[in-house]
Amino acid sequence: MTTQQPVAVLGGGSFGTAIANLLAENGHQVLQWMRDPEQAQAIRVNRENPRYLKGIKVRPEVEPVTDITATLEACELIFVALPSSALRAVLSPHVERLNGKMLVSLTKGIEAQSFKLMSQILEEIVPQARIGVLSGPNLAREIAEHALTATVVASEDEALCQQVQAALHGRTFRVYASNDRFGVELGGALKNVYAIIAGMAVALDMGENTKSMLITRALAEMTRFAVSQGANPMTFLGLAGVGDLIVTCSSPKSRNYQVGFALGQGLTLEAAVTRLGEVAEGVNTLKVLKVKAQEVQVYMPLVAGLHAILFEGRTLSQVIEALMRAEPKTDVDFISITGFN
C-alpha cells in the first residue's frame, strides 16, 4: 500500500463509518462503499450518516461510493464491515480483484450454515488474500466521539498487523496486535449473545450482584467453548475477550444489549429487533452456538437458557430457577493450573 492509495471500508453502518473517519483523521483518503445510493448521496451532501451515526460529521476525506468494482481495484487495504449474511454475496464476484490484498474483517458474527467466522469466510472466498480481524471493546459512537479506545488487530500475517496499526493508531485510538486470529474473532462473536442476557437483566432491575455474576460466568462459558475449538484462553483475558464482554454487557449503546433490554421490557423478539433498526448479530449467533455447543458437548447454561426463552417458549422465571438450582461447577475451569502453586 503506497501513501497515494486510498483505503476501502465496505459497509455503510455505524462501525464502518467510525473506522472510515478514523482513517481519514490519520491522513488517508477513504472510499466507503455502500449498497444504497440514497444513503451515499445523503452522506455526500450532508457529511453525516443519519441512519446509523446521527450527529457525527463524516470527514471530507471519506468518499461514499456505490461502485464496488472500482473501489476494490483502487485499494490494497480493505476493511470489511458488512453484515455476516451479506459477506459471500457481496465479495464472491470479485475474487480476482481481491487476490493478494489485505482484508480486515470488522464484523462480529458467525455464519449460520457452517459455523464459520467472518475471516474464515473471507479466506474461503479469496484464498490468496491476506486476512486479519479487528475486534475489541469498540462502541462505534464512542470511537466517532473520540473516547479513548483500544482494539486488537489479529492475524498470522505480522506485516498486515503493522499496516493496520499504522493506518488506525492515533491520539484516541490504540491498536494492539495478536497472532490468535481465531480467538480474537471468536470472542467478538460470542459476547454478543451475553449482551442480550445483560440487557434483559438491567430492564428487569436485577441488581449489581446479578449483573456481575452474569458477566463473569459469561466469560467462563465463552472461554470454555473457545478453548474446546482451539483458541488460546489467554486471549479471553484481554481486550478482545473480557474487554469486549464488559463494554457490550454494560452499555445501552450496544445493539445486542438494546435488544435484550427491549425483551426485558416485554417486547417480542421480532419487535425488539425491529425497534433497533440495525443488525443485532447476537440473535443469529445464539441459534448456531446452541447447536454447536450441543454437538461438541460443551456446557453452556446461559446460552441454553436464553435460547429456551427466545425460541422454546420457556419463561424467564423458569430458566432462572433452573440455572440457580443447577449443580455448582468450578469457578475458573478454562485455564490450566499446571505450574501454579
Curated annotation (Swiss-Prot):
Keywords: Cytoplasm, Lipid biosynthesis, Lipid metabolism, NAD, NADP, Nucleotide-binding, Oxidoreductase, Phospholipid biosynthesis, Phospholipid metabolism. Its EC number is 1.1.1.94. NADPH binds at S14, F15, R35, K108, A140, R255, V279, E281. It is an enzyme of class 1 (oxidoreductase). It is found in: Cytoplasm. Its main location: cytoplasm. Catalyzes the reduction of the glycolytic intermediate dihydroxyacetone phosphate (DHAP) to sn-glycerol 3-phosphate (G3P), the key precursor for phospholipid synthesis. Belongs to the NAD-dependent glycerol-3-phosphate dehydrogenase family. This is Glycerol-3-phosphate dehydrogenase [NAD(P)+]. It comes from Pseudomonas savastanoi pv. phaseolicola (strain 1448A / Race 6). The lineage of its organism: Bacteria, Pseudomonadati, Pseudomonadota, Gammaproteobacteria, Pseudomonadales.
